[in-house]
Every structure is written in structure tokens, then in C-alpha cells.
């Protein structure tokens, strides 16, 4: 069994890498192609069915994704847009679950509690796929912030509501007041726990002053934040997100530069792999979902899926437009009109209600038995959830780039990005001038003249490059200089390789020199990209 599991895991990782490469070449969203390929392989003959273990995803795969999203989230942006984020992450989730429960109760005669289970499962959108597309097309920052913030919090709302609904099915009812009190306790408790974990482990990392120990503590942080609240009856989501947000805000002051450099690569690879495997696993579940219903149930299942798909799309649009414009229409304060989003921005937020892994995990977590009886409508919940995920991810996800271009938000975002780039260059110029001022002080204090002169020429050259960029002067000389520098680094690499081959260098010395050359290569590419405005210098 262990051998089979290892082979399956290895095969999934390999297929994730190959499919991601194909998605890049085909210029389609990676998440969509991973789900499609996974679904196709699920029905391939002679291949074993792969059943997703929801506890495995919740305990091992979800915490690092949540924590990493929290670290990448701007705390200033989160605070600035807290109201719309909470309206979407809490209000829209509860509204969607309630309407789905009512509709399925009246149209499909589902018990109220079962309807709320289905509503809670399909209510939280997944921000991974739409965020990747929106960033690539330079959507305005405020939209990205709202979508990202919604994605951080809505999972917690949905999973807590899901646990209440499953409990109501088992017990036959639930107290609304009691549920509200429990919800408040969970929210406050998880935020407090997330802050405690974020503070303690971040300061422990700063105290350790050891890069490897810091990285181990960083990798343990999401699990330390998520697991205790989860096992105590909460969701764990808010705790992991809060720990990430705390690290995002205070990390730059406490994390060493070496750990930060290493963390970029470690976390980037880990999250890339986890996201890919999760979407691939989502596609692989299609066979198990399709084999569940009895032959006579298909018409009812398909009808339920159509109703739910239409509902979740329409409900989100209704909520988004109402939340955006009703407060302005009802407000007597004219200042409120100046912060009202455009209809294009509102439409895009409404359109990005793509469901993903949390919905699938919640559906698979529905127990098979309630006491001695089968859980009512479990197969229907699984089938409908998978249809909602597939239609929203493949349908809305594939159409999202065209919708963004049609609304003209790519042009708005491009202008905003250009303004942000100018601000970045201005900040870089100020930083270099501060370094030059400090260099003059050191020269006055008796610093070695030759070293100071070399450093001064280096910083003045960087200053000239960024001043030219800020003034709109052709950046071609900067790119040309970067190309020459990279050729020099390549020549140095070749020389080191030949000397190592001639046994003039030890392995340890070769690795030290290669690491220095790698850092120099990365610095040159980073600076060239920043000057040219390509992705703000991301490597």
C-alpha cells in the first residue's frame, strides 16, 4: 500500500509539472488545465481511482496555502478595504448559503439542514485561479486586494457554517443564538491564537540567528497556527491567515536577509507544488463523483446541479452590486459617492466567484453515516459541488481574461501599474542618495579612499540608471549594460568550471564561488527588470 501511494504521489507531482509547462506554452490558466487533465486521467482505463482524503488536504495542504496568502497580503490594503472584504467574505458567504438552502428546500425538497450543508459547501470562492489571471492582466490594485482579502477569510466563514449545518443534520436542529455565540468565540479565539503564534515564532526566528532554524520555524508556523483550533472545533483558517498577516507586517524588521532570500525560493516552490497537486487531485475526483449516483437519480442530480450553478452565479452578482451601490444610494453623505466603485469593477468582482479546493474538501468531508443512518443526499451534495467547481473554474476561469479586456480594466490597471513603478523608482533614487550621503560621511571619518571611490562610482551609476527611468529616458542602455554584466558572469563561471575540472579548486571553494555568482546573476536580472518595469523585478 505504501509503495502504491508513493508511486501515485510521484506520478501526480510529475504530471503537475508537465501540465503546468503545457499550460504556459498554451497560454491558458494553469489551474484550469490541471483540473481538465486530472478529470481526463480519472476515466483512463486500467488506472486506479484516486480518492482524495479531505483530512489530508485540510491538515497538510491547506495551512501553508493560507499562511503564504496571508504573508503575501498587504496589511495596509487589508485594513483600507476591510469593509468590502468583510461584506464579501462573511456577508456574501452567509447570503449564498441561505439562498441555496431555501431554493433546494423548496425546489428539491431537501431538509433545511441538508440544504445549508450544500449551501455552505458551494459558498466560498477560491481566489487562486482568478488572482493569477487578474495579476497577469494588470487589474487595478483595489480589486486584487478585495479578491485576495475575501479569499483569506471566506473559507473560515464557510467551514464554520458547514460544521454547524452537519451538526444540525445529526442532532435535528441548532440554536441560531448559540451558533452565533460559538461563531464569535471561534473568530476571536482563532485571531488571538494566530497573533500569538505569529508573534512567538517570529521572535524565536529572530533570536535564533540561524538561517536553517529560521526556515524550519517558518515552515512549522502555518501548522502550529492551524492545527490546535481545528482540533478544538474551529476551522483553523483564521489562525493561519492571522499568523501570515502578522508575519507580513512585522517580518521585515525581524527576519534576516539570508533567510528572506532562502524563503522566497522555498515557499515559492512549496506553494507552487501544493497548488498544482490540489487542482490535479480535484480533477481526479470526477470518476468517484460520477460513479456515486444510482442510474435513476441522474435527472434529479443534473437538475440540482443546474439550479445550484445558476444560483451561485446570480447570487454573487446580486450581493456585489447591492453592497457596492445601496450604501451610496441610502447615504446622505455626499462623500460616499467618491469611493463608489465603477460598474466595471463591480461586475468583475461579481464574475470572479470561482469555486475550488475548499468546496471539494468540504463536500468530501460530509460523513457517510449519521448514527446508524446514511447521511441524507450525500451523493447529491458531492455531484452538485463538483459540477459547480467544474463549471465555474473551466467556464468562468477561461472567460475571465476576455471579460477583463472587454471591461477595459486591463488598461486601467496598466496605468495604475505605471504610476506605481514611477513611485518605486523615486523611492529607489531616494535610497541610493541616502547611501551616497552616508558614504560621504564615512569618507570624512577616514574611510579607505580607494574603496570609497569605487563604491561611490557604483552607486552613482545606479542613481543615473533610475533617474533616466523616472524621466522616461530610453531604458535600452540599462538593458544593454545588464546583458554585458551577465556575459561577464557567464565568462567567470566558465573559468571557475575549467579550474575545477583541472583540480585547482576544492568542491567547497567551487560551491562558494558559484553561490556568489548566482547572487550576482540574480541581482543583475532583478535590477534590469526593475528599471524596465517588467514585473517590478520579480525573479
Regions found by a protein language model. Name each.
Residues 1-421, 426, 433, 502-504, ...:
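Transmembrane helical cores of multi-pass secondary ion antiporters/exchangers
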Amino acid at each position: 500500500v505504501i509503495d502504491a501511494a508513493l508511486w501515485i504521489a510521484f506520478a501526480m507531482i510529475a504530471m503537475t509539472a508537465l501540465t503546468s509547462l503545457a499550460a504556459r506554452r498554451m497560454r491558458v490558466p494553469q489551474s484550469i488545465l490541471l483540473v481538465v487533465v486530472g478529470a481526463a486521467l480519472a476515466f483512463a482505463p486500467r488506472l486506479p481511482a484516486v480518492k482524495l482524503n479531505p483530512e489530508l488536504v485540510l491538515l497538510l495542504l491547506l495551512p501553508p496555502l493560507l499562511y503564504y496568502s496571508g504573508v503575501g497580503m498587504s496589511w495596509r490594503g487589508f485594513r483600507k478595504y476591510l469593509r468590502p472584504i468583510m461584506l464579501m467574505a462573511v456577508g456574501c458567504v452567509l447570503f449564498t448559503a441561505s439562498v441555496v438552502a431555501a431554493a433546494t428546500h423548496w425546489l428539491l425538497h431537501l431538509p433545511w439542514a441538508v440544504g445549508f450543508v450544500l449551501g455552505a459547501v458551494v459558498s466560498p470562492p477560491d481566489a487562486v485561479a482568478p488572482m493569477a489571471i487578474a495579476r497577469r492582466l494588470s487589474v487595478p490594485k483595489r480589486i486584487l486586494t478585495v479578491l485576495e482579502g475575501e479569499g483569506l477569510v471566506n473559507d473560515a466563514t464557510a467551514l464554520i457554517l458547514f460544521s454547524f449545518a452537519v451538526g444540525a443534520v445529526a442532532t435535528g436542529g441548532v440554536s441560531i443564538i448559540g451558533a452565533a455565540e460559538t461563531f464569535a468565540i471561534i473568530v476571536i479565539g482563532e485571531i488571538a491564537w494566530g497573533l500569538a503564534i505569529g508573534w512567538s515564532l517570529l521572535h524565536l526566528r529572530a533570536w535564533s540567528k540561524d538561517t536553517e532554524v529560521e526556515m524550519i520555524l517558518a515552515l512549522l508556523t502555518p501548522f502550529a497556527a492551524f492545527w490546535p483550533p481545528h482540533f478544538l472545533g474551529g476551522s483553523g483558517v483564521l489562525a493561519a491567515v492571522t499568523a501570515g498577516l502578522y508575519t507580513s507586517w512585522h517580518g521585515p524588521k525581524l527576519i534576516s536577509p539570508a533567510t528572506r532570500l532562502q524563503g522566497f525560493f522555498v515557499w515559492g516552490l512549496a506553494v507552487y507544488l501544493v497548488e498544482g497537486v490540489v487542482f490535479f487531485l480535484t480533477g481526479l475526483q470526477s470518476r468517484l463523483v460520477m460513479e456515486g449516483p444510482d442510474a435513476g437519480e441522474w435527472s434529479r442530480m443534473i437538475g440540482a446541479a443546474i439550479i445550484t450553478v445558476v444560483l451561485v452565479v446570480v447570487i454573487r452578482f446580486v450581493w456585489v452590486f447591492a453592497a457596492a451601490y445601496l450604501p451610496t444610494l441610502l447615504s446622505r453623505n455626499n462623500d460616499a459617492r467618491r469611493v463608489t466603485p465603477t460598474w466595471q469593477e463591480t461586475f468583475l468582482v461579481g464574475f470572479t466567484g470561482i469555486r475550488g479546493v475548499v468546496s471539494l474538501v468540504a463536500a468530501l468531508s460530509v460523513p457517510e453515516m449519521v448514527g446508524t443512518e446514511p447521511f441524507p443526499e450525500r451523493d447529491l451534495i458531492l455531484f452538485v459541488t463538483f459540477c459547480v467547481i467544474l463549471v465555474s473554474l473551466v467556464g468562468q476561469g477561461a472567460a475571465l481574461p476576455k471579460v477583463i479586456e472587454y471591461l477595459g480594466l486591463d488598461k486601467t490597471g496598466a496605468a495604475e501599474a505605471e504610476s506605481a513603478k514611477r513611485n518605486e523608482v523615486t523611492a529607489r533614487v531616494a535610497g541610493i542618495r541616502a547611501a551616497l550621503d552616508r558614504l560621504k560621511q564615512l569618507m570624512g571619518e577616514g574611510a579607505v579612499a580607494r574603496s570609497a571611490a569605487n563604491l561611490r562610482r557604483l552607486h552613482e551609476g545606479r542613481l543615473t540608471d533610475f533617474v533616466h527611468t523616472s524621466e522616461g529616458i530610453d531604458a535600452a542602455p540599462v538593458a544593454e549594460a545588464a546583458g554585458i554584466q551577465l556575459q561577464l558572469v557567464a565568462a567567470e563561471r566558465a573559468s571557475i568550471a575549467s579550474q575545477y575540472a583541472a583540480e585547482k579548486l576544492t568542491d567547497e571553494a567551487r560551491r562558494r564561488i558559484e553561490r556568489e555568482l548566482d547572487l550576482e546573476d540574480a541581482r543583475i536580472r532583478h535590477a534590469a527588470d526593475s528599471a524596465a518595469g517588467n514585473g517590478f523585478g520579480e525573479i
